[in-house]
From Swiss-Prot:
Pfam families: Asr
Gene Ontology CC annotation, any one: periplasmic space
The species this protein was found in: Yersinia enterocolitica serotype O:8 / biotype 1B (strain NCTC 13174 / 8081)
Task performed by this protein: Required for growth and/or survival at acidic conditions.
PTM statement from Swiss-Prot or TrEMBL: Proteolytic processing gives rise to the active protein.
Keyword Electron transport: no
Keyword Transcription attached: no
Stretches for region Disordered: 30-132
Biased composition (Low complexity): 30-50, 61-99
Protein name in the entry: Acid shock protein
Key words, A-Z: Periplasm, Signal
Propeptide cleavage-removed residue intervals: 22-69
Amino acid sequence: MKKVLALIVAATMGLSSVAFAAETTAAATAAPAATSTTAAPAVEKAAPAKATHHKKHKATKQTTEQKAQAAKKAVKKAPAQKAQAAKKAVKKAPVQKAQAAKKHVKKAPAQKAQAAKKHHKTAKKSATAPAA
């Protein structure tokens, strides 16, 4: 009953598990003075509690390392996608503009030349008609 109460108080106050383990071992050493048969199991139970504490501590380290790796992966992926999209957009736009400019330049002079030829032909015909 006292151990449960001590556990609740330690949890609410935020004491570290190391301090709590020290309290349980102190209580275990006081118990052998009272009875020797119940003291032996209490001492055996105190040692595994410390071992589990170390395992939990290692687990928390792994989670922080995993978070760091996930953050690195996310940072690497985003800029690569942006760079690819920028390259594609820059390459496509100038090619289309150049093609459109070529088409307009070629069509306009061809029409002007044909119109000029027609005018010259009609002018020549009219000039030769009065002479004949």
